[in-house]
A protein has these predicted regions:
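Alpha/beta-hydrolase superfamily serine-hydrolase fold, recognizing
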Residues: 1-282
Length: 282
């Protein structure tokens, strides 16, 4: 069969760029410098349209991370009209908190400084992340301490306008350990650089729940009820704190879902995520 078909162009071309250096940081006992990188998916066409940006922050217990994880899923957001960025951050093997949130905020500032190049609407930024990345998503939304902004592009704001954390640790002072020795070796203590059982107040003050104010951006929190790694109550506590402060917040409790289960990658849930970002980021 021979057929002539006329196709109207209604969608832009989507460009994926990997390993963009957004910052250089000290490494190996401050004797060297290394690049921090991000991956980006953005639309490219002949118009001057700008698109909201969603920053993805992967998990890994703060001890390992791979910014390329889930890029195939993240492309779904790009096709819904968002610029999507997956950001590398330093792990607790390289340094303690707040190093990790400093990296995330540096990436946000870099993207805003290069908004024209990547077709970004710099006034409409969201963040989404899983587990350890969910913690950093919360802190990107809630921690406005100017001391967290270090490095380049300090003329740009690192603030975001919407947050979607998945199964996030939100109160590092309430994780349960059988004894101080187990606590000292925990991912939470390694992140903070001290034994949490012996520094409860400090751990609380380094947690998202301690940073909630009435000025928090909208939140969509997603957590599996059967999570055996980060208890569901962690998200409930953050949600309750947001509501107490009059903030815009929703909590989706996934029935039967454990930590990072396949339920988090089903179309039904992603439709809710896309709807959230479209409404909150315009």
């Amino acid at each position: 069969m021979k057929e002539k078909l006329k196709i109207n162009v209604t969608k832009p071309q989507y460009v994926q760029v990997s390993d963009i250096t957004y910052a250089q940081v000290d490494s190996w006992y401050d004797h060297c410098r290394r690049d921090l990188k991000l991956d980006l998916i953005y639309p490219e066409d002949m118009s001057d349209k700008r698109y909201p940006c969603i920053v993805w922050i992967c998990g890994g217990g703060w001890i390992r991370m791979d910014k390329s994880a889930h890029l195939s899923y993240l492309s779904t957001l790009a096709h819904q009209g968002f610029v999507v960025c997956s950001v590398e951050y330093r792990t607790s093997n390289e340094g303690c908190y707040p190093m990790q949130i400093e990296d995330v905020k540096a990436a946000i500032r870099y993207l805003k400084a290069h908004a024209d190049r990547y077709r970004i609407d710099k006034e409409h930024f969201g963040a989404m992340g899983e587990s350890a990345g969910g913690f950093l998503t919360c802190m990107a939304a809630l921690d406005h301490d100017k001391a967290r902004d270090v490095g380049e592009y300090l003329e740009e704001s690192s603030s975001i306008q919407a947050a979607c954390p998945w199964y996030p640790p939100t109160n590092l002072s309430t994780f349960k350990y059988k004894d101080a020795e187990e606590c000292a070796a925990s991912m939470e203590s390694l992140l903070l650089g001290y034994n949490i059982m012996r520094n409860i107040k400090e751990a609380y003050n380094s947690s998202p729940v301690s940073k909630v104010t009435k000025d928090a951006p909208p939140f969509l929190i997603i957590h599996g009820i059967n999570d055996q790694t980060v208890p569901f109550e962690q998200s409930e506590e953050l949600y309750d704190k947001l509501i107490e402060n009059g903030c815009d917040a929703d909590l989706i409790a996934l029935e039967g879902a454990d930590h990072a289960d396949l339920q988090f990658f089903q179309d039904e849930l992603w439709d809710r995520i896309i709807e959230f970002f479209k409404i909150k980021l315009g």
